[in-house]
Amino acid sequence: MTDVMVVLKVFPEGDETDLEKVANELVSKLPEGYKLVRKETEPIAFGLKALVVYVSMPEKTEGGTDTLEELASSIEGVSHAEVVGITRLGF
C-alpha cells in the first residue's frame, strides 16, 4: 500500500500556546501507520505562529485526512487544524 504525505497547519488558541508541547502530544496520539516526518513553525500575524507538521500516513485510510485534522484539533491549546497539502509518496 502506498503512503501519502499530509501537510497539516495547526492553529493555536493564542500566542501563549506551547507549540512544542502540541507537537509532542500529536505524535503520541498518531494512529498506527502514521509518522511525523517534519515540523516547523510559520508566522501568522502579530507574533502568533502556527505549527506546520508533515505526516506520512497510509493512502487508503477510512475517513481520509479528517481523522488527522480532528485529532490535532482535539489537543488542548489548539484552535483548529487544516490540511494545506497532500502528495503521494510511492507509485
UniProtKB/Swiss-Prot annotation:
Q: Which InterPro entries match?
A: eEF-1beta-like_sf, EF1B_bsu/dsu_GNE, Transl_elong_EF1B/ribsomal_bS6, Transl_elong_EF1B_B_arc
Gene Ontology MF terms in the entry: translation elongation factor activity
Q: Which residues cross the membrane?
A: none
S-S bonds: none
Alphabetized, the UniProt keywords read: Elongation factor, Protein biosynthesis
What does this gene product do? Promotes the exchange of GDP for GTP in EF-1-alpha/GDP, thus allowing the regeneration of EF-1-alpha/GTP that could then be used to form the ternary complex EF-1-alpha/GTP/AAtRNA.
Q: Which family does it belong to?
A: Belongs to the EF-1-beta/EF-1-delta family.
Can you say what this protein is called? Elongation factor 1-beta
The gene for this chain is ef1b
